[in-house]
């Protein structure tokens, strides 16, 4: 059963009256089969997030990906840390000259493509030898979140990375990928100062370098948490004539109203994601580039706190259906975070059903 069919079935079951309840008398239902239809693209199953890049080499990761692919016609997977030192992309020799190694990158992306999905490339994080400082994020895998010490070397890395992908997979293939610059630079995933201006500098270098490799490569940002920085980002790329092929940002039902909307308004948890999407959609429409697609590259349903593990329950299906209904027409892609619980932001998963983000629990158990 496809995801869309499953959602429809869930809605139909939910709409059935409880046995014994007062039911209205049956009556005719008229449907105008000649009425003008409206397209309903499956924006919610085009992309999924996952645990960080290196985990894509695991057999359990790939098996879970294949299982989800059977029921959801998703085309892209997005994950953090393709430039983490554990992937081995960047080093420097004794003279300080860059040394590149794309062996693990090839194995990671080959594994996705062999299973019928493409990378939604998140360009992160900073290789230690390229970092201005050794600022690390508190995730278990301790990624470096500082700016580069030398933008010439950063540009060289991005150019070599993109050129290698084009050489290996061909421009007709890689032109169908997306390249998103960094992850949530407005919070503790980026320690540049001033925070926004320094991120824009990183974005400008990265976007222009990608386009120098081939103008068909698609790049975007600002990849922020809580739907932030979109208007300043759009103003910046327009004013400075920086390439941007899409807008990306994140928003979760568990994000606070203050963070999402900068207001004290009382907004229910189950309305926050699509209200935030509507806000960003309007910001794009008001910008100098109103036709840019909106990629919501992280979201999930309310967790209701760690003690309830709501994301391990059948509640998720109904919550997803409600979000799809609310968000229709406002967004091009929503990338659910994540497709499975092969995921180690807080350490190695000890047991299934521990409240993880994924649709498949540890051990390949379908939620």
PLM region descriptions:
Residues 4-15:
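Bacterial N-terminal signal peptides
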Residues 18-20:
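Sec/Tat signal peptide C-region and signal peptidase I cleavage site
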Residues 22-75, 208:
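N-terminal carbohydrate-binding accessory modules
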Residues 34, 55-69, 228-237, 314-324:
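Short, acidic/polar
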Residues 50, 80, 182, 250, ...:
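Conserved residues at the C-terminal ends of beta-strands
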Residues 64, 254-307, 323, 332-341:
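Glycoside hydrolase catalytic-domain groove-lining segments
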Residues 72-266:
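Substrate-binding cleft and catalytic face of glycoside hydrolase catalytic domains
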Residues 296-367:
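Aromatic/acidic polysaccharide-binding cleft in carbohydrate-active enzymes
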């Amino acid at each position: 059963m496809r995801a869309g069919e499953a959602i429809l079935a869930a809605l139909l079951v939910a709409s059935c009256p409880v046995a014994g309840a007062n039911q209205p008398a049956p009556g005719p239902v008229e449907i105008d089969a000649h009425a003008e239809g409206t397209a309903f693209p499956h924006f919610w199953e085009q992309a999924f997030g996952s645990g960080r890049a290196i985990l894509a080499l695991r057999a359990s990761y790939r098996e879970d990906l294949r299982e989800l692919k059977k029921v959801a016609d998703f085309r892209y997977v997005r994950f953090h840390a393709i430039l983490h030192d554990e992937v081995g992309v960047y080093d420097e020799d004794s003279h300080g000259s860059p040394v590149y190694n794309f062996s693990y990158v090839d194995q990671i992306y080959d594994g996705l493509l062999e299973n019928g999905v493409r990378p939604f490339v998140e360009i992160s994080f900073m290789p230690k030898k390229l970092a201005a400082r050794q600022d690390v994020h508190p995730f278990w895998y301790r990624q470096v979140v500082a700016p580069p010490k030398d933008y010439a070397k950063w540009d060289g890395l991005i150019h070599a990375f993109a050129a290698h992908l084009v050489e290996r997979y061909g421009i007709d293939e890689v032109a169908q990928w997306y390249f998103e610059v960094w992850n949530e630079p407005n919070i503790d995933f980026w320690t540049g100062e001033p925070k926004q201006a320094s991120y824009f500098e990183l974005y400008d270098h990265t976007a222009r370098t990608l386009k120098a490799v081939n103008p068909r490569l698609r790049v975007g940002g600002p990849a922020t948490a809580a739907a932030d920085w979109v208007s300043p980002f759009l103003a910046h790329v327009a004013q400075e004539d920086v390439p941007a092929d899409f807008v990306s940002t994140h928003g979760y039902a568990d994000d606070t109203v203050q963070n999402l909307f900068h207001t004290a308004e009382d907004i229910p948890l189950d309305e926050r994601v699509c209200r935030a999407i509507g806000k960003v959609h309007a910001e794009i429409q008001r910008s100098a580039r109103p036709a840019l697609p909106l990629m919501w590259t992280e979201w999930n349903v309310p967790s209701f706190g760690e003690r309830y593990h709501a994301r391990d329950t059948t509640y998720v299906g109904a919550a997803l259906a409600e979000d799809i209904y609310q968000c229709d027409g406002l967004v091009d892609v929503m990338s659910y975070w994540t497709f499975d619980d092969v995921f180690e932001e807080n350490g190695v998963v000890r047991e299934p059903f521990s409240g993880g983000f994924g649709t498949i629990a540890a051990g390949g158990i379908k939620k």
